[in-house]
Amino acid sequence: FTTIHNYVDVNTMILRKGAVSAKKDERLLIPMNMRDGSLICTGLGNEDWNCSAPHGAGRLMSRKDAFDSFTLSAFEKSMEGIFTTSVARDTIDECPMVYKPMEEIMNNIKETVIVEKIIKPIYNFKASENAGGKKRGKE
């Protein structure tokens, strides 16, 4: 299955910005963060939600605030148990603490999807725009 976000559904004329289709019995993926993984869900077709669901956990803060708020060591600690080569100063803006908690998201989406499975990462990779370049964030 595929999960597309930020588009116009020409069949229903619904604009989904930051959302994905969650029609009745439709399978979809909602990513949480690089530590907690993703939710595999089945849509409920809730018209009050425009048959939609969020396309991800949602950020708690801006990228700049993330660089100002978290240290590389805190990021490293949060990723213990998951193999990754992506924990670096220039990816602090993607650390798990920057996103809303999975439990909160799962509670908030009960009216639009059924969470079938939580898939946890064993390996995580994030490309870095600034690899080898400007260093941002705190040590």
Over which residues does each language-model region extend?
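Domain-length cofactor-binding catalytic modules of enzymes
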Residues: 1-139
